């Protein structure tokens, strides 16, 4: 068993060290992570400049790119062997609902999935690493289970969110669907030293769809949320309606 460990908070983040330790003894480990915090970079790849890779004193490799860059470079030339599993995290804060579209943590795992490798993204529900030990224990337990009993044939992608509470207070694992958030808060406008306007992206919106069965609901109730993800963004339920509309629009536009 060979495991690739990545993240989006950077190679110095406590969450990465905790996930690496959670994987100790489960196989050969390779760690490839961003040089700097790259939260919110989604699935971006760096195409406008070359990437450099360095090795830290603890053996972690890090590069001046995005989380997706890290996994992509690892899988397409950096590593001597293809990993059997890709794990990403442990993120400093939740990646639930719409967060998954922006998350570098999820993106790193998704990059592994795109290459046909089972992959898991781990996130602690609140910022600050208060119960990082809880998240690490959950990660260890889940990784052990998927190694011992693969859930489905072939590649798969899981998004795991762990409540920020003592391990003894967890209420178990739940399979969930993604919830939804309200739109983000307005941008924060400030001025630079020249008096020119600058903008900071506003905070994420509150949960909008957080009913039973969603990741938001599970975590709020003290459950570890386990959400299977896929890459296909097609709205299959709307395909017939759009097909009919295009036929009508085409006839009307002649």
Swiss-Prot record:
Any Gene Ontology CC annotation: cytoplasm
Reaction(s) this enzyme catalyzes, per UniProt: a ribonucleoside 5'-phosphate + H2O = a ribonucleoside + phosphate
SUPFAM superfamilies per record: SurE-like
List of residues binding a divalent metal cation: 8-9, 39, 91
Annotated keywords: Cytoplasm, Hydrolase, Metal-binding, Nucleotide-binding
Subcellular location: Cytoplasm
Pfam families to which the protein is assigned, alphabetical: SurE
Keyword Hydrolase: yes
E.C. number: 3.1.3.5
Co-factor note (free text): Binds 1 divalent metal cation per subunit.
Names of the cofactor(s): a divalent metal cation
GO molecular function terms listed in the Swiss-Prot or TrEMBL record: 3'-nucleotidase activity; 5'-nucleotidase activity; exopolyphosphatase activity; metal ion binding; nucleotide binding
Family annotation (InterPro entries): SurE, SurE-like_Pase/nucleotidase, SurE-like_sf
Top-rank taxon: Bacteria
Role according to the record: Nucleotidase that shows phosphatase activity on nucleoside 5'-monophosphates.
Family under the similarity heading: Belongs to the SurE nucleotidase family.
Official protein name in the record: 5'-nucleotidase SurE
Species assigned in the record: Methylibium petroleiphilum (strain ATCC BAA-1232 / LMG 22953 / PM1)
């Amino acid at each position: 068993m060979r495991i690739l460990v990545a993240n989006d908070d950077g190679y110095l983040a406590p969450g990465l060290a905790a996930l690496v330790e959670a994987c100790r003894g489960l196989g050969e480990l390779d760690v490839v992570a961003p040089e700097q915090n790259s939260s919110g970079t989604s699935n971006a790849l760096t195409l406008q400049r070359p990437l450099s890779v360095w090795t830290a004193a603890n053996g972690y490799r890090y590069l001046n790119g995005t989380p997706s860059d890290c996994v992509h470079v690892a899988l397409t030339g950096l590593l001597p062997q293809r990993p059997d599993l890709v794990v990403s995290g442990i993120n400093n804060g939740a990646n639930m609902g719409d967060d998954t579209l922006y998350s570098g943590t999820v993106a790193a795992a998704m990059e592994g999935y795109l290459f046909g490798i089972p992959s898991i993204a781990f996130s602690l529900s609140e910022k600050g690493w208060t119960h990082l030990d809880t998240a690490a224990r959950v990660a260890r337990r889940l990784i052990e289970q998927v190694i011992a009993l693969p859930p489905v044939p072939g590649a798969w992608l899981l998004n795991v969110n762990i409540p920020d509470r003592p391990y003894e207070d967890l209420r178990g694992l739940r399979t969930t669907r993604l919830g939804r958030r309200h739109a983000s808060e307005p941008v924060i406008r400030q001025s630079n030293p020249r008096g020119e306007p600058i903008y900071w992206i506003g905070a994420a919106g509150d949960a909008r769809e957080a009913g039973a069965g969603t990741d938001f609901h599970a975590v709020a109730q003290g459950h570890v949320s386990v959400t299977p993800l896929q890459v296909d963004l097609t709205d299959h339920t709307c395909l017939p309606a759009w097909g009919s509309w295009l036929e009508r629009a085409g006839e009307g536009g002649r």
